[in-house]
């Protein structure tokens, strides 16, 4: 998935999923909070793959157990209605500090949900030519040429 879409929550904490993203998700999907306190949307298939990997992690490691609690405790299964609207639970909105305005960002196999101000601060970094030059070097080291 790719692309960036601005959305405004309605009075019931719902937004409309863009059609391109909706087509990729195919049915019910999951909203989770990541460690950066950004919300992530995954299809059933992608969520199952990630849940399986987390389940295979060493359950004797207290840090990994804590992560599993955090991740699964901050995940909900969601369905869109016929208009493509879906509810983002208040606890997840609060965790991500989303009040009204937000961005949906397609990031490969998931969609991130960012609060407006935080996304705009993040995006502004890419106007720094020194930062982008450093990033390009790192990408080349990883075998990614733009």
UniProtKB/Swiss-Prot annotation:
<comment type="subunit">
    <text>Forms oligomers.</text>
</comment>
<dbReference type="GO" id="GO:0003700">
    <property type="term" value="F:DNA-binding transcription factor activity"/>
</dbReference>
<keyword id="KW-0805">Transcription regulation</keyword>
<dbReference type="Pfam" id="PF02381">
    <property type="entry name" value="MraZ"/>
</dbReference>
<dbReference type="InterPro" id="IPR037914">
    <property type="entry name" value="SpoVT-AbrB_sf"/>
</dbReference>
<dbReference type="InterPro" id="IPR035642">
    <property type="entry name" value="MraZ_N"/>
</dbReference>
<dbReference type="InterPro" id="IPR038619">
    <property type="entry name" value="MraZ_sf"/>
</dbReference>
<dbReference type="GO" id="GO:0005737">
    <property type="term" value="C:cytoplasm"/>
</dbReference>
<dbReference type="GO" id="GO:0009295">
    <property type="term" value="C:nucleoid"/>
</dbReference>
<keyword id="KW-0963">Cytoplasm</keyword>
<dbReference type="InterPro" id="IPR035644">
    <property type="entry name" value="MraZ_C"/>
</dbReference>
<feature type="domain" description="SpoVT-AbrB 2">
    <location>
        <begin position="75"/>
        <end position="118"/>
    </location>
</feature>
<dbReference type="InterPro" id="IPR020603">
    <property type="entry name" value="MraZ_dom"/>
</dbReference>
<dbReference type="InterPro" id="IPR003444">
    <property type="entry name" value="MraZ"/>
</dbReference>
<dbReference type="GO" id="GO:2000143">
    <property type="term" value="P:negative regulation of DNA-templated transcription initiation"/>
</dbReference>
<protein>
    <recommendedName>
        <fullName>Transcriptional regulator MraZ</fullName>
    </recommendedName>
</protein>
<feature type="domain" description="SpoVT-AbrB 1">
    <location>
        <begin position="4"/>
        <end position="46"/>
    </location>
</feature>
<comment type="similarity">
    <text>Belongs to the MraZ family.</text>
</comment>
<keyword id="KW-0677">Repeat</keyword>
<dbReference type="GO" id="GO:0000976">
    <property type="term" value="F:transcription cis-regulatory region binding"/>
</dbReference>
<keyword id="KW-0238">DNA-binding</keyword>
<dbReference type="InterPro" id="IPR007159">
    <property type="entry name" value="SpoVT-AbrB_dom"/>
</dbReference>
<keyword id="KW-0804">Transcription</keyword>
